[in-house]
């Protein structure tokens, strides 16, 4: 086991404070509409240019082990805010830096760190409650666009495209962000349910110009096993042929004789048919088949519930207005499912989202939720170079997280104003002792830090602006983009309540932990001697006459 170095008390805290300040100073340069970029060297390829706080924080690793501990704790603040709300990482970092700096002054003056932390925690709870009281629902497209614009560093085009996407697929719908091929941002929307499985045979194609198979008003057969024997399917194929309607088969697989027979029937025009593999794997495949069944009003043919292909009737089949199959995807448009059943299924999946602890499972469940409740929108980000593309894509993703947070918990006035207004929640707050009162005062001063930093980044005098904003009331604040005072909501400067709340909670949590640190332990890095070189080979005698 490697030897460890231990630092105590003030010397440990001073080292950690240096690390906190190095990381926070790099991150806070990006805050606000006039925040600057940070350029990050990569081990290969061009450097990355970003205004995203968490991207900057993740890249910082300090040489001194004790300073690095402080930096890593603040990095955790940014990550927590990002995980919880998807944005607000820079605000969280600025708050944490201020709490640590103000708090350590109090510790140096002889205050008890544990009571300071309790005071900070009490004040945080009161301010979060006040923030929730200030919050207004984010209902219309205009508000959604404003939130997206602010989060994307005042880029109107990003806010507008996110609002348009949410309008088209609903607030629950899946919106994905991809790299586009042009210079402009583009939005494409897939209506209905789409899953990533294409036709099993190109012979099902009936629209050669677009290379798709299109079925109008089809019946839909859902089977949770492989189909290889055509005899099992004859009864249902005959019934479908009599009904004179197309048929879509969604099964674990269709192979061999069964697939060949379907292709022949389709080409001869006896039954217009197309087959596709069921999406997903294992239990997720069963769940997705059930989703399709609910959406189309059909039943999954499964031996688990006593149904076999031979006994399948038209009543077991689902219905849809149209189905389009391409090489990679299948889209079911306007399924004939009962609305109440679809809503019950949506509620069930929402509960699973709330219960799961796996990020991967949550993402897959949310995709299923969107497919049932609206559709899928794809934002294709346009840019002039690859470096710009990466930077812009990160901003679009941030803005998307922020708008989702705004829809979830509402909005408050932006630009650091909501935190200033929430201070009234701790005007009369008293701790159990004098040290806790100092903890409350520490947070009171820290709350001003985001507004001070926004103003500093825009080149104005922070103290003057903070004083004027404090004298105002309600939504009155300072627009750093135009250097004007006014109603922040009317000026379209909004922050999602969830983002502001998460930033404050993450900052006070980690800030309090740093204040209560009394000892720090780090590994001693030993300088290893350089590896020995190859021994001298000496001259090779007798070679002189070779010239």
From Swiss-Prot:
Coiled-coil boundaries: none
E.C. numbers: 5.6.1.7
Keyword DNA repair: no
Enzyme class: isomerase
GO cellular component, one term: cytoplasm
Pfam families: Cpn60_TCP1 (PF00118)
Primary localisation category: cytoplasm
Reaction(s) this enzyme catalyzes, per UniProt: ATP + H2O + a folded polypeptide = ADP + phosphate + an unfolded polypeptide
Family under the similarity heading: Belongs to the chaperonin (HSP60) family.
PANTHER family: 60 KDA HEAT SHOCK PROTEIN, MITOCHONDRIAL
NCBIfam families, per the entry: GroEL (TIGR02348), PRK00013.1 (NF000592), PRK12849.1 (NF009487), PRK12850.1 (NF009488), PRK12851.1 (NF009489)
Function summary: Together with its co-chaperonin GroES, plays an essential role in assisting protein folding. The GroEL-GroES system forms a nano-cage that allows encapsulation of the non-native substrate proteins and provides a physical environment optimized to promote and accelerate protein folding.
The name this protein goes by in its record: Chaperonin GroEL
Organism (species): Pseudomonas fluorescens (strain ATCC BAA-477 / NRRL B-23932 / Pf-5)
């Amino acid at each position: 086991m490697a030897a460890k170095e231990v630092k105590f008390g003030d010397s440990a805290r001073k080292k950690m404070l240096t690390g906190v300040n190095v990381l926070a100073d790099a991150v806070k340069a990006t805050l606000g509409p006039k925040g600057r970029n940070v350029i990050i060297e990569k081990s290969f390829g061009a450097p990355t240019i970003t205004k995203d706080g968490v991207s900057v924080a993740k890249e910082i690793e300090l040489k001194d082990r004790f300073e690095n501990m402080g930096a890593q704790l603040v990095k955790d603040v940014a990550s927590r805010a990002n995980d919880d709300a998807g944005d607000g990482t820079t605000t969280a970092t600025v708050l944490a830096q201020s709490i640590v700096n103000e708090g350590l002054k109090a510790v140096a003056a002889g205050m008890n760190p544990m009571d300071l932390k309790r005071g900070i925690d009490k004040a945080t709870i009161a301010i979060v409650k006040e923030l929730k009281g200030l919050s207004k629902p984010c209902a219309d497209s205009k508000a959604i666009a404003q939130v997206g614009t602010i989060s994307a560093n005042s880029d109107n085009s990003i806010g507008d495209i996110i609002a348009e996407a949410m309008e088209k697929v609903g607030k629950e719908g899946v919106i994905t962000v991809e790299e586009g091929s042009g210079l402009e941002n583009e939005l494409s929307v897939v209506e209905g349910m789409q899953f990533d499985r294409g036709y099993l045979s190109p012979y099902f194609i009936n629209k050669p110009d677009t290379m798709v198979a299109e079925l109008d008003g089809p019946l839909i057969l859902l089977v949770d096993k492989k189909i290889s024997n055509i005899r099992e399917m004859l009864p249902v194929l005959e019934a479908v042929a009599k009904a004179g309607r197309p048929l879509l088969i969604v099964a674990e697989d269709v192979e061999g004789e069964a697939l060949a027979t379907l292709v022949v029937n389709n080409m001869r025009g006896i039954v217009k048919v197309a087959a596709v593999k069921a999406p997903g794997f294992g239990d997720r495949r069963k769940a997705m088949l059930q989703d399709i069944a609910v959406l189309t009003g059909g039943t999954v043919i499964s031996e688990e519930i006593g149904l076999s292909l031979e006994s399948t009737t038209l009543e077991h089949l689902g219905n849809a207005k149209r189905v389009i199959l391409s090489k990679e995807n299948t889209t079911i448009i306007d399924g004939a499912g009962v609305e109440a059943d679809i809503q019950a299924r949506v509620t069930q999946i929402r509960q699973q989202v709330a219960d799961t602890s796996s990020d991967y499972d949550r993402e897959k469940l949310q995709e299923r939720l969107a497919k049932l409740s609206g559709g899928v929108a794809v934002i294709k980000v346009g840019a002039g170079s690859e470096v710009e593309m990466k930077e812009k894509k990160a901003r679009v993703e941030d803005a998307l997280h922020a708008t989702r947070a705004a829809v979830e918990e509402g909005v408050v006035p932006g630009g650091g104003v909501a935190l200033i207004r929430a201070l009234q929640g701790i005007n009369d707050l008293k701790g159990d002792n004098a040290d806790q009162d100092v903890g409350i005062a520490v947070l009171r001063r820290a709350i001003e830090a985001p507004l001070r930093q926004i103003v500093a980044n825009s080149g104005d005098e922070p103290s003057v602006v903070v004083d004027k904003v404090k004298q105002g009331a309600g939504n009155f604040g300072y627009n750093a983009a135009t250097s004007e005072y006014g109603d922040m909501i009317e000026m379209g400067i909004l922050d999602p309540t969830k983002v502001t709340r998460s930033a404050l909670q993450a900052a006070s949590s980690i800030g309090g932990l740093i204040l209560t640190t009394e000892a720090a332990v780090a590994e001693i890095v030993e300088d290893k001697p350089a590896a020995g070189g190859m021994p001298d080979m000496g001259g090779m005698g007798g070679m002189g006459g070779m010239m």
